[in-house]
Curated annotation (Swiss-Prot):
It comes from Haemophilus influenzae. GO terms for molecular function: transmembrane transporter activity. This is Sialic acid TRAP transporter permease protein SiaT. Disruption phenotype: Cells lacking this gene are incapable of transporting sialic acid and thus unable to sialylate its LOS, making the organism unable to survive when exposed to human serum and causing reduced viability in biofilm growth. InterPro entries: DctM, DctQ, TRAP_DctM.
Length: 616
């Protein structure tokens, strides 16, 4: 059983390394040997579909898919147990339908993939049913634990029997499922989309993982309207992962993990300490400065909070800082990551909005620096008021030694940005280069990274990627419903009726995102609302590069605000303190962040000037 439990991890880790090698070969073939590989990109995308699906399966087993629990946490224990049982039942149905639709799309696939020697696209579509069967097995494993620990009323045997019965019906009497077509009984017309959206909100807020709730709502819509087109729509579940720009996401995740395991994080922190530690509020400045440097390599807010957080909080405690400020600064400074290039959030926005990722990278730099300086100013004020001690000023020799040890790590952002703008590699390939560079530094320079650690890091990155992959798949499916019913256009018409200028629209959008960010995870929020907000921005002639940076900053504020502020929970965990302590500490640091948001909203040129200058 031990080896079976590791099946996805070993297979996914091996495929992850295979993609890594293929894309490194692609860069070398083009830049060194001047002979591009025509098959590498297509093969990498095909393997990524499997990596993403295997990651979803791992997250099902560990029950790590993104969900909203603030309402269920308020429920009495018996009601919460009943609600959790309902949630598990809905997830079970989703996985069964993944298998069902996966088989149908696999059988219908016939086109060749020319870049891979004409092999059938069935190889891509096979990922959905094959891995979904594995998901079902993992789901039943998880339910065994849930029943034993009293989290569910339904034992695993119930789901096993249900699965056997449903598969028997599927293979021997598939027409029986036609009774589930609501359109056979009720004709709701254009109201169907509103029913689907209402159901989506209800099941999402009772704890159904966000990705699965999107899938259920969309299927409900199709059952009320156009079930005959559902097969074509479900093809998008797989095609949504068959995207080259999305390959950057898992490799920036991997880079952040490798920085922690390869000794890079500690050296970045020590350099920031030698540079800033002797000023008033020095250790707070070190915390913020280290986050700026770290963000230039990992591109993730929570990677910063989790990777640097423990190190930063310990150093601040040792220097005499109160826990609330230790936690508050650590949480607040982590939002620099998604703004300063490279940025996972910017990559996702670029894919959704079909905008230049290189431009987005550059556009986020100035706001990132502004927030860094603003947080340092607030830290200085608090440190002076509370009388925190300074650390002794480092000597020139100590500063040089610290710089020498961290030099190769600090070089990473310059390598990434320089490579993109020199044309050596694309923004997607920059993630591969960053990960490869982290391997080289960790293995051969700092000598703290082993091959076993590298493989385990790939497995961890694959598992995190699975959470993102489910969101990408189901939000694309959900987007088909939104597009068919022109929901984005309807929302835009409401904005047009209320707003009289682009600034008014931006204020309304900021207010909406700030409110939603209190309850919905930033990643989920990005996938859910951007497809509806981007058309509104276009209708008011708002620059989409500016819009991407503004919405990214806004959503990052969401990870700092309760009750769903993920950074608060991560920092509380790594710092061994209560969430309320972190929340208390982060409140004063929200002021400079809000001021920066207002500033860039009123003066978008702060964001657009540099990218327009460098990339006409």
């Amino acid at each position: 059983m031990k080896y079976i439990n590791k099946l996805e991890e070993w297979l996914g880790g091996a495929l992850f390394i295979a993609i890594f090698g293929i894309l490194i070969a692609q860069i070398l073939a083009r830049q060194v040997f001047h002979s591009p590989l025509i098959w590498s990109e297509e093969l990498a995308k095909l393997l990524f579909v499997y990596v993403g699906m295997l990651g979803i399966s791992v997250a099902v087993r560990k029950q790590e898919h993104v969900f909203i629990d603030f309402l269920t946490n308020l429920m009495p224990e018996k009601i919460r147990k009943f609600t959790n049982t309902l949630v598990q039942l809905l997830v079970f149905i989703c996985i069964f339908l993944f298998i069902h639709f996966g088989i149908r799309t696999f059988n219908g696939a016939s086109f060749p993939i020319d870049a891979l020697g004409g092999i059938s696209e069935k190889w891509i579509f096979a990922a959905l049913p094959v891995v979904a069967i594995l998901m079902m097995f993992r789901f039943i494993q998880a339910q065994t634990l849930n029943f034993k620990t009293g989290k569910s009323y339904l034992p695993a045997t119930f789901f096993i029997i249900s699965a056997v019965v449903l598969f028997a019906i599927l293979f021997f009497a598939p027409d029986w499922f036609k009774v589930l077509r609501i359109s056979n009984y009720i004709k709701l017309g254009s109201s169907s989309v509103y029913v689907a959206l209402l159901v989506w909100l209800i099941i999402m807020f009772i704890g159904v993982p966000v990705g699965w709730s999107l899938f259920i709502a969309t299927l409900l819509y199709f059952s009320m309207t156009r079930w005959n087109v559902v097969n074509a729509a479900t093809e998008k579940l797989v095609y949504s992962l068959d995207s080259f720009p999305l390959l950057a996401v898992p490799f920036y995740i991997l880079t952040g993990i490798l920085m922690n395991t390869g000794g890079i994080t500690e050296r970045i922190f020590n350099f920031a300490k030698s540079l800033l530690g002797h000023y008033t509020g020095g250790m707070g400045h070190v915390n913020i400065g280290a986050s700026l440097l770290f963000s230039g390599m990992s591109g993730s807010a929570l990677a910063d909070a989790g990777g640097l957080g423990q190190l930063e909080i310990k150093a601040m405690r040792d220097a005499g800082y109160d826990d609330d400020i230790c936690g508050g600064i650590t949480a607040a400074s982590c939002i620099i990551g998604p703004l300063v290039p490279p940025s996972i959030a910017m990559i996702i926005y670029g894919v959704i909005a079909n905008e230049s990722i290189a431009k987005l990278f550059i556009a986020g730099f100035i706001p990132g620096v502004l927030i860094t300086l603003a947080l340092m100013a607030m830290n200085y004020r608090i440190a002076k008021k509370r009388g925190y001690p300074r650390t002794p000023k480092t000597t020139r020799e100590q500063l040089c030694s610290s710089f020498k040890q961290s030099f190769w790590a600090i070089l990473t952002p310059l390598l990434i940005i320089g490579g993109i703008f020199s044309g050596l590699f694309s923004p997607t390939e920059s993630a591969i280069v960053a990960a490869a560079y982290s391997v080289i530094i960790g293995k051969f320079v700092y000598k703290e990274l082993t091959l076993k650690t590298l493989f385990n890091s790939c497995i961890e990155a694959m598992a995190i990627t699975g959470v993102v992959a489910l969101m990408i798949m189901t939000v694309t499916f959900f987007g088909d419903m939104i597009a068919r019913e022109q929901v984005a256009m309807r929302v835009a018409n409401v904005f047009v009726a209320v707003a009289d200028s682009p600034l008014t629209v931006l204020v309304m959008i900021n207010a909406l995102l700030l409110f939603l960010g209190m309850f919905i995870d930033a990643l989920a929020l990005q996938f859910l609302v951007l497809p509806m907000l981007i058309p509104i921005a276009m209708q008011f002639n708002i620059d989409l590069i500016f819009f991407g940076v503004m919405t990214t900053l806004n959503m990052m504020i969401g990870i700092l605000t309760p009750p769903m502020g993920m950074a608060l929970f991560v920092v509380a965990r790594v710092g061994n303190m209560s969430v309320s302590t972190v929340t208390k500490g982060v409140l004063p640091f929200l002021i400079p962040v809000f001021v920066t948001l207002v500033l860039i909203t009123i003066f978008p040129q702060i964001i657009t000037f540099v990218p327009n200058l460098l990339i006409p």
